Amino acid sequence: MARARIEQHWALAEFGAAELGDVRRQARLVQLARQLAERPEASLPQALENGAALKAAYRFFDNADIAHEKILASHVVSSLKRLKGHQVILAVQDTTLIDYSTHPGTEGLGPLHAKGGHGMICHGTLAFTPARLPLGVLGLRLWARDPEQPQRRTTRRTRPIEDKESYKWIDSVRAIAVLKAQLPGTRWVSVADRESDVFEFFTEAQALGVDVLTRAAWDRNVEGPEGQLFAELAAAPVVTYKQLALPARGKRKARTAKLEIRACALTLECPLNGSGRGLHPIALWGVWAYEPKPPAGVEPLDWKLLTSVPVTSADEALERLDWYAARWGIEQWHRVLKSGCRIEQRQLESFERLRRLLTVYAVIAWRILYATMLARLVPGMACTAILNDDEWQALYCRIHHCPAPPATPPPLKQAIRWIAQLGGFIGRVSDGEPGTQTLWQGFQQLIPMTEMYRIMKKPKLTRSSRPHKNVGND
């Protein structure tokens, strides 16, 4: 498991290798990342120290020579270092809409959906371990739809895949293949939701040697006695059972679902429409997790998964389900990005400026999520994994109302709970572990607290103790 320390100047580790054509731009990026991370919820004028810093930030985000891909590239290099030594990496990709409908004057944005909305599309790829520790943002595609060319269902089937938004899945798996070549001993699995159930996505991943794990959206034709995917899965044997804890989501209450798990080998036939020309049938494995007896009035959990990773036993079927559940991690990242970093409230004048800014916040949001999950997965490690000495000492003194901290730093799990306590976490037995929201709110309280601690612990010079010149003879 990755146990790399996040140094005091973490921004240097994540952005210090950015190749932006000028070392001054690189230094500005590192400084901006550090300042924005200290107050992720604040507007730019609030987060930056003075008018000069704000003006420099606007110049940076307005610079057409700085591509957002170059901003992210340095973080990807750091992420690959964290990935070394892992046998399996789950490259989870997902799409979210960034809504700027309240800023209609921003140039270069486009429609979000048929019913309205104005903003950009964000398609990210995050690296997770099978234990769901996020190790970095591997890819970030940001684009705005053309308002002159609405997405028409009538022409979608006949258009080439390169002209569809679903090409994002293929583009991302190609980027994963490039990273895979740098870690040849690691199995890379692209994990995605039902929107990625695109035949060309499966064939491209197979050609590149990247495994896939996706949720089926279409009842495709398959080779075999049943002829259809869903019927073939229903006819497969039950290999095991599982109880799955479902977190609260929207109006859905938290509950435990009792699932029966079926699994079998499958061969998907090529699509019958024009998009299937030149393709060949593809062999995959299917896993169906179904809740036969849900609570009254509750829709049953129903996951039909397709994967290129073999499923030959009950344990392997359960492992694929656990891997797919890692998708919740990228949804948490979206939440931190929108609610914690308040990216949809940012007011810059153009799409390109927003794209550069969002890339910086994408890494800041990852760091918050990383700290949260690290405390859950490695609770006994020292809190210096994410806090410098002044931070944990200030935190300890504040929580315990004492003037001096102990010599030994507390465990990471305890420190995280204290930080969350600053953000409103009560810590009752029924509350479970702190979430990302109370954690980022707590970090915001910790920053000024640490600054005051640094000031107060400095040696104090009184009038009588200050050095002075002798005015008489020695």
Ranges and model annotations:
Residues M1-T106, A114-I121, L126-D474:
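Single, function-defining residue in the core of a domain
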